[in-house]
């Protein structure tokens, strides 16, 4: 597994250096008005679905709100709509409002995020506009001063890590250390080891852990979700795609196959970015959904988090050309 992961990670970070592009240009595209109409329609649908219990809860009440609305979120297509609005449609409108300097569009999309928060109690959804705008400002500043953003982020993370290690003996330092190092960086590695040990003596899923595959094949060999099965019910944490779609699916071959799929996806992203006259738009629009790739199945990332939908929009919908043209290269 170590050798496979080494090759996979080298491929992951080296894709951008390979001058290979997929032919994805589409000549006839839909009007962007269609996206606005779909966004409004889904918003009205969700407001109707959650109409009995929507409120602007403070951070001490959000878990109660989540529990109260859990049945609504998990029923039918509601959960997908929540993710698609939070990861695709509202960010798309927000970014276009920022780049096109349209304050009305920006504030309407922010209202959309607030409505989603009132339905789900998810703090991440409420903070998405701030996170996206901060990334936009950082990217714009790095272009202005001609600084490599990747190197800047590496330096910032390194300095932040050193700072945390210096104050880890304090209560605040311990809390930040547990959140940053353990929850953000170490859980994926710990779960990978657990999955490797578990599937040495238990049957692989052969991708039947994916809901749609299991509905077609009925091959899923366990009675509960993978996160609970592997840990014997002790936890239910989402694992990295190399773990769920790799080790759990079919061992070594699973890691190899999902790595190939990931590389093809990255080639597709590079091809889409190359066709767009404003590649900063392409970079930022993937930010909300990109965070999900760190702790979920790649197929969940594509479908539930709306990445496949976002790619289809970039390929088949005419993005307005009056956005402020900023090129990163």
Where are these regions (language model features)?
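Internal alpha-helical transmembrane segments
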Residues: 97, 104-130, 134-171
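Short hydrophobic/aromatic segments of transmembrane alpha-helices and their interfaces
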Residues: 106-110, 236-238, 282
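Short, 15-30-residue, compositionally biased linear elements
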Residues: 103-104, 233
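Helix-loop-helix junctions and helix-breaking kinks within/between transmembrane helices
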Residues: 1, 111-136, 247-254, 296-305
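Small-residue-enriched transmembrane helix-hairpin modules in multi-pass membrane proteins
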Residues: 62-76, 80, 161-267
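Membrane-anchoring hydrophobic segments
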Residues: 1-94, 100, 140-164, 257-329
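Short, hydrophobic/aromatic alpha-helical segments in well-folded domains
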Residues: 93-94, 113-114, 242-245
